[in-house]
């Protein structure tokens, strides 16, 4: 087959342009990414050798080999892993089908240091090699194939694929280094970078180099060159080591390599269990959220091993989805090596490991919560996701409630339910909360006024998930939850019922409101829980389901709501005497617009509102 030329997809071209011209900070991470990719290829081959009958007889010692030529300014990374065929090369190294390129580009901030730190997290690590290389040659052969292929590119919009000769399965990547980056073709530089980032890659990494010695003295001195191949990493699964052997630095360096994250984790949990079940877990709580945390197709951050043999890294059942930000490893001694991913979903051993792991992780989060400043670093990126557990994890619901934090009417900072309950007033029977789309609008809600008169605090819930999970939370520490906008809550305030004579007096005015707003509202009611506000938009029918649909990205048709009026307000008292129908209509619409502003913070038809306001002002002046 002759050389076939292909064009990179548009997003790949943008990415390569950034790699070549912009992201100069921390260039050395390219080697971390290529070694990590090689390790993944070895993991995948190990898994296939356990599950594919045709490959069970393969006798392979998995390893990664690095070599360099300082004269030619080349660096080569070679593995004997799963390898790639022609389609794999096109898909993985030419399109965005299997990478996070689009997400990476949208996440760029313009800060070179921060942006270079994103490379590994978005699955675009291979392209980081173009930061140091002006040409890359990939030679690869898939373990299930017969033909080897070469992929060549200078990163300038195109790449070529051709057939080549390669006996062993696996991938060999040769970088032709730029002049200014030729120092990476040196023994000490490679050794230093590997020890920094890839010390605990669970496969041996060998470095081939030429060792020069001098024998004799004076004119008789001879230069003797000897080619050597040394293992330069520990190749130890860090999670299998004794905690007493490890330092904080070891855990953090392993995290940075494992999670492709240059930042330090907030915390880690290393646990070894022996008894009826034997397994080891090492979990990390990151300091920042994964880029895909709120995507349906998020990638699990946990890898499953059986007796140190990699099984899968895309099983979302290893931990519940509300802990999807957690990174780490589960290594079981009891699962069969040839376990399939389908069997994993019903496996009792894994279910027990999962249950115990969740408790360990929640306990660690509880430890973080004891330091308010430190907990804020956790809660800001992960608090919304943690709330999701209230819907599905009934076993740990009480623990989750302890860990959640909320804004409230009386506090500027986030408060726990324990803190809220400690400040309950003497006659207060419930924990009150108010749902809305915006914290500032919730703080301005007229509904809060009657609660304020009683001295009752109200939790203000503005996260999208709140409307879905909170109605399913009945109580905390034997104290019931109540939606502050519901009639049961308002009854607890001891408000007097609106008398029939008041209803009779407002009957005609309410009818005028209904006639003017018939296309906008479901109906009009007099309210006894408003103080300074004239009007308020009531609850949306099926609010919980509507909010859930919005959260899932589905369009929700606008539903009509009830308009609540304050019969004690001076404006309504004056409107009772208004006989000018045109002027009354303008006032009614202005009051409705005001209520909509309190609810949404904006109006759909600002032009009409402005015209009505000008008309009323003109008549008043």
Predicted regions and their residues:
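GHKL (Bergerat-fold) ATPase N-terminal catalytic module, capturing the glycine-rich phosphate-binding loop
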Residues: 1-179, 183-184, 192, 425
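GHKL/Bergerat-fold ATPase module in large chromosome/replication-associated machines
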Residues: 118, 136-158, 178-182, 188-621
């Amino acid at each position: 087959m002759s050389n076939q030329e292909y064009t990179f997809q548009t997003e790949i071209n943008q990415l390569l342009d950034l790699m070549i011209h912009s992201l100069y900070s921390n260039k050395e991470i390219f080697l971390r990414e290529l070694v990590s990719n090689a390790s993944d290829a070895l993991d995948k081959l190990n898994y296939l050798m356990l599950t594919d009958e045709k490959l069970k007889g393969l006798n392979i010692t998995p390893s990664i080999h690095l070599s360099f030529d300082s004269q030619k300014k080349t660096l080569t990374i070679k593995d004997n892993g799963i390898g790639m065929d022609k389609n794999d090369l096109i898909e993985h190294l030419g399109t965005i089908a299997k990478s996070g390129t689009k997400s990476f580009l949208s996440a760029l901030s313009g800060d070179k240091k921060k942006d270079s730190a994103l490379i590994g997290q978005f699955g675009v690590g291979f392209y980081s090699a173009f930061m140091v290389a002006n040409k890359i040659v990939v030679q690869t052969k898939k373990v299930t194939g017969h033909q080897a292929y070469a992929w060549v590119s200078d990163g300038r919009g195109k790449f070529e694929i051709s057939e080549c000769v390669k006996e062993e399965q696996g991938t060999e990547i040769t970088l032709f280094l730029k002049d200014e980056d030729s120092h990476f073709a040196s023994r000490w530089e490679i050794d230093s970078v590997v020890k920094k980032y890839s010390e605990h890659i669970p496969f041996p990494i060998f470095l081939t180099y030429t060792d020069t010695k001098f024998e004799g003295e004076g004119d008789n001195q001879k230069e003797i060159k000897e080619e050597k191949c040394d293992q330069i990493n520990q190749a130890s699964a860090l999670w299998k080591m004794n905690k007493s052997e490890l330092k904080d630095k070891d855990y953090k360096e392993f995290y940075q390599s494992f999670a492709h994250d240059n930042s330090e984790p907030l915390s880690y949990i290393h646990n070894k269990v022996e008894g009826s079940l034997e397994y080891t877990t090492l979990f990390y709580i990151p300091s920042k959220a994964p880029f895909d945390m709120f995507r349906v197709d998020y990638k699990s951050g946990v890898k499953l091993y059986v007796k140190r043999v990699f099984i899968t890294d895309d099983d979302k059942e290893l931990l519940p989805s509300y802990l999807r930000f957690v990174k780490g490893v589960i290594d079981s001694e009891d699962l069969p090596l040839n376990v399939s991913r389908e069997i994993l979903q019903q496996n009792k051993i894994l279910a027990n490991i999962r249950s115990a792991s969740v408790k360990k992780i929640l306990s660690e989060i509880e430890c973080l919560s004891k330091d308010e400043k430190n907990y804020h670093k956790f809660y800001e990126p992960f608090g919304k996701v943690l709330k999701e557990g209230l819907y599905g994890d009934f076993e740990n619901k009480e623990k989750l409630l302890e860990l959640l934090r909320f804004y409230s009417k009386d506090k500027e900072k986030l408060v726990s339910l324990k803190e809220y309950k400690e400040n309950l007033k003497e006659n207060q029977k419930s924990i009150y909360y108010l749902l809305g789309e915006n914290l500032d609008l919730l703080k301005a809600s007229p509904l809060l006024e009657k609660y304020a008169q009683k001295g009752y605090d109200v939790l203000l819930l503005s996260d999208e998930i709140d409307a879905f999970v909170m109605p399913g939370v009945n109580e905390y520490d034997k104290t019931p939850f109540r939606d502050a906008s519901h009639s049961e809550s308002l009854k607890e305030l001891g408000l007097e019922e609106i008398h029939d004579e008041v209803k009779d007096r407002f009957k005609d005015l309410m009818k005028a409101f209904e006639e003017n707003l018939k296309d906008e509202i479901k109906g009009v009611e007099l309210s006894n829980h408003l103080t300074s506000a004239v009007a308020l938009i009531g609850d949306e029918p099926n609010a919980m389901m509507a909010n859930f649909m919005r959260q899932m990205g589905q369009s929700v048709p606008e539903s009509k709501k009830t308009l609540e009026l304050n019969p004690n307000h001076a404006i309504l008292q004056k409107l009772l005497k208004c006989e000018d129908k045109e002027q009354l209509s303008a006032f009614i619409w202005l009051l409705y617009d005001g209520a909509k502003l309190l609810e949404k913070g904006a109006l759909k038809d600002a032009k009409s509102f402005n015209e009505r306001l000008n008309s009323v002002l003109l008549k008043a002046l």
